[in-house]
Amino acid sequence: MIGKRGAGLALLGAGVIGLTAGCGTQTAPATTPSLHRQTAPLSTSLVTPQGTWAVTVMGGSATSENNFWQVFVRPAGASRWSLVTPEGVADNGGLVATGGAGGTSVLVGFRPSQALAFSPLAVSSDTGKNWTPGLLDADLADVPDAMAAAPSGQTLALLSDGSIEAAATAGAAAAGQWSRLTTLSALAASAPGRSCGLEAVNAVSFGINNVPMAAGSCVRRGVAGVFADTGGAWQAAGPVLPGGFGGDQVQVLGLTRTADGNAALLAAGSDLLAAWSDGGHWTVSGPVASGGVSASGFGADGSVWVLLGGGRAETISGPGSSWQALPPVPAGTAALAPGAGSGGYDALAVSGSKLTVWQLTAGAWAKVQVINVPIQYGSSS
């Protein structure tokens, strides 16, 4: 379903280096409108050279701490999913996952719960068969793109207070050797932060040449808050949106690295936009009406998927393409994941401790797998 402003909006924006467009070129308004912050839920999927990963919550009520977050993987070349949640750490607070350095591993962070004040980490280089523990002595943010790793091994972690921590290598991250890259107040006080009225950081990533990036929610209407740390100074690095969005506050719900640059998911008023950067310019999709995002994620090729209300799901394959509505998803669908073959999607539906995998075949959802997760209700209370 396409939103009110039409489709196929391809616009040139600022690159990471020598940026002259985006929020850094505009002056903040004299009066500051209020902002209702939007973020993407933690349930998501991601694709690495090892395979396709999904993160979702199962079990029962979060109030009684019977919610248990799980990690599933479908190894590259395989058609079936496996439960590979790292053991030994309470995961009621949620899980955040990102591809590790060079795509040879996956890094999972545990959001604090049960009075923990830090975020345990786990790294696997064998599709979740074995996990090596690590530590972030702080609390990860409650967003799916709260961690990012560059091919060089440098790792970023977004904290719940909007600060960003950095580790020089994957080994340093696992050893708990993190240092402060910036804070929300410092980023908001920078030139691009002031000009867009930055109020929250929602995602971290890396751009070309391993440049650290951050994205968030801005008060100034019509401005997408994406920032790049080049040479120790933050610069505007986001897309310029078409004039039809000049009256909408824009919030970046997701940001990820792609083979050519970056992909982003943005909320602009009641619409969603996808955007892709090749490091020199951005291409912005046409809008799709939102009504609220219940889950979202990216494919390895820059594709984007979103779960919306009422069983709606929309996908877009990349620059120059349009949003496509999938058939209504099966009841309980918590996340989508790119299918094992060319094109298509899997829907991962949750009912208590049972995960049902549905595959989109010939325009209809077909049940292909059921995984019963051994959940010990009451073990966290």
Q: Where are the regions that the model predicts?
A:
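C-terminal motif of bacterial Sec signal peptides marking the signal peptidase cleavage site
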Residues: 19-22
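Bacterial signal peptide processing site
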Residues: 24-26
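Beta-strand-rich domains and repeat architectures in extracellular enzymes and scaffolds
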Residues: 34-71, 91-97
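Repeated scaffold domains used in trafficking and secretory/extracellular systems
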Residues: 38-47, 89-101, 139-151, 189-206, ...
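Entry beta-strands of beta-propeller and related beta-repeat scaffolds
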Residues: 48-56, 102-108, 152-157, 208-215, ...
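Short glycine/acidic-enriched loop and turn motifs that connect beta-strands
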Residues: 58-65, 110-116, 162-164, 217-222, ...
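Conserved Ser/Thr-centered positions that define the repeating blades of beta-propeller domains
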Residues: 74-75, 124-125, 165-172, 227-231, ...
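Blade-level signature of beta-propeller repeat domains, shared across WD40, Kelch, NHL, RCC1
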Residues: 336-381
